[in-house]
């Protein structure tokens, strides 16, 4: 079995995957909403029409991600207020940090914290760093940040405790767009230096 499931209230099922990469490929025609987590998928459904067991039986683990995942190239100005701190903690130069950050390919594992805030895996292990001891009251939209094993881009102005290494003018969240979040789970992201 590749996943286990649990009822999540009367109108949802939580799938837990032994292989977290499979969560991007989970589809269900009976689900009204699919929410991807770090190793789970939440399927919300119409409880008046379906039972938990019906929804679970309709889950398919096809190659859905391969056909829908997008690739994004994000231009970044590497001038974040925590850039030197992250380089120092990583025991590499700022130039080396930028080189490593732009050579990696990241995958959007899941979204959370704020609309359009994608947790990107693929960060060089040397650059894994703790969050700030004291969060900032306001992090500007477009801030490129790292914390723990993840990289992210703040899609809107918000409070935040991640280490800021750069900024982008790319729009990551547009509530008027058909898909408001630019980067969605399963998508890949690469960063390039603004010259």
Label the model's feature ranges.
Residues 1-195:
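Conserved "landmark" site that anchors the functional core of diverse proteins
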């Amino acid at each position: 079995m590749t996943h286990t499931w649990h009822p999540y209230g009367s109108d949802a099922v939580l799938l837990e995957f032994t292989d977290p990469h499979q969560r991007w490929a989970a589809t269900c025609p009976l689900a009204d909403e699919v929410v991807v987590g770090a190793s789970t998928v939440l399927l919300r459904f119409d409880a008046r029409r379906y039972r938990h067991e019906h929804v679970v039986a309709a889950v398919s683990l096809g190659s859905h991600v391969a056909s829908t995942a997008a690739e994004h190239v994000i231009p970044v100005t590497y001038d974040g207020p925590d850039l030197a701190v992250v380089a120092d903690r990583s025991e590499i130069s700022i130039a080396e940090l930028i080189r490593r950050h732009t050579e990696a390919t990241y995958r959007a594992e899941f979204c959370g914290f704020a609309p359009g805030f994608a947790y990107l895996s693929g960060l060089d292990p040397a650059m894994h760093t703790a969050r700030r001891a004291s969060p900032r009251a306001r992090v500007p939209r477009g801030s490129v940040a790292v914390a723990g094993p993840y990289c992210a881009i703040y899609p809107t102005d918000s409070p935040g405790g991640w280490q800021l290494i750069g900024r982008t003018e790319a729009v990551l969240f547009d509530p008027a767009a058909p898909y408001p979040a630019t980067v969605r789970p399963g998508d890949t992201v690469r960063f390039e230096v603004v010259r």
